[in-house]
From Swiss-Prot:
Gene Ontology terms describing biological process: iron-sulfur cluster assembly; RNA modification; tRNA processing
Pfam families from the UniProt entry: GCV_T, YgfZ_barrel
Protein name: tRNA-modifying protein YgfZ
InterPro entries: GCV_T_N (IPR006222), GcvT/YgfZ_C (IPR029043), tRNA-modifying_YgfZ (IPR023758), YgfZ/GcvT (IPR045179), YgfZ/GcvT_CS (IPR017703), YgfZ_barrel (IPR048451)
């Protein structure tokens, strides 16, 4: 298979409906950091404590500007001799140039890896099928496993699924193995699962717009409040200790004539009136016509609030429960 050639689009399904599915993650990109200073350098750039990251764990953290606004969020893990992270392809070039700004002063090489193949495996029997190909699989206790040139990541949300970072040869083997047994789909299916999981999606139109807490990164254990300095730390800390953050990530579901675009606001019902509010991070339409929206909204929104897509009077969107708690330890 060609590198990151997307599979044909299929109807999108919820995690509970999904049959065995191999997903081309062409909307995501891989970056690696190698060199003696890789950990030290990244420690000064992202919200997670890289010094404390075990080699068998991955973390969703944020890379911020000096004002604490996220250039991107990063799914960070060890791969081979270095560190690696996955982010949305749309923000890759800009985020990478920001991350590299001070790299000339350190022994670190930061590089996109366009030849790497990213695949998702989800749905019924995903684990059993991968066990036929790989000697060891990641799990809830050890969510990162290295095998040869492949790195496997385990996710429990919204249901058991796997992300594979590999080369063209191994990817082709998996494609052939699953040819008669699995549905193939493109990145939109993985996006749907991320929305269901409450994992924030940062694309170009939402880059440098939000502090990490506005997208629930703290609830996903992606912010260390005890590590040393990193870019944007002061603003991120202020949001926690001074209550400066008034927003949160929400998963909305319902009916609409269209899926709203990234960066659009929504309309919130107040009695007989509608008020514009929030900002859309991602939206998809499922096979049954249901629209899912991931949006940043006021964090004091009542659970029974009714929203709609802007200028769509027939639209009705309601708040769905996220599979994790937003209650913070004080």
């Amino acid at each position: 298979m060609a590198n990151n050639t997307p599979f044909a689009a299929q109807p999108l399904l919820t995690s509970s409906e999904l049959p065995l599915t191999l997903i081309s993650l062409d909307d995501w990109a891989l970056v690696t950091l190698t060199g003696a200073d890789r950990v030290k350098y990244l420690q000064g750039q992202v919200t997670a404590d890289i010094d404390a990251l075990p080699t068998d764990q991955h973390v969703l953290c944020a890379h911020c500007d000096a004002k604490g606004k996220m250039w991107s969020n990063l799914r960070l893990f060890y791969r081979g001799e270095g560190l690696a992270f996955i982010e949305r392809r749309s923000v890759l070039d800009n985020q990478l140039s920001e991350l590299k700004k001070y790299a000339v002063f350190s022994k670190v090489v930061i590089a996109a890896q366009p030849d790497a193949v990213l695949l998702g495996v989800a749905g019924t029997q995903a684990k059993a099928v991968l066990a036929e190909v790989f000697a060891e699989l990641p799990n809830a206790d050890h969510p990162v496993v290295q095998q040869g040139d492949s790195t496997l990541l385990y996710f429990s949300l919204p249901a058991e699924r796997f992300l594979l970072v590999t080369d063209t040869e191994q990817a082709q083997q998996l494609v052939e193995k699953l040819a008669d047994r699995a549905q193939f789909n493109n990145s939109k299916q993985w996006l749907a699962l991320d929305i269901e999981a409450g994992f924030p999606i940062i694309d170009t139109d939402s880059s440098a717009q939000f502090i990490p807490q506005a997208t629930n990164i703290q609830a996903l254990n992606g912010i260390s409040f005890s590590k040393g300095c990193y870019t944007g730390q002061e603003m991120v800390a202020r949001a926690k200790y001074r209550g400066a953050n008034k927003r949160a990530l929400y998963w909305l579901a319902g009916s609409a004539n269209r899926a709203p675009a990234v960066g659009e606001d929504l309309e919130w019902q107040l009695g007989e009136n509608w008020r514009r509010t929030g900002s859309v991070l991602a939206a998809i339409t499922l096979s049954d016509g249901t629209v899912w929206v991931q949006a940043v909204l006021n964090n004091d929104l009542a659970a029974d609030s009714v929203l709609r897509v802007r200028d769509d009077a027939e639209s009705v969107l309601t708040i769905q429960p996220l599979p994790y708690s937003l209650t913070e330890d004080k």
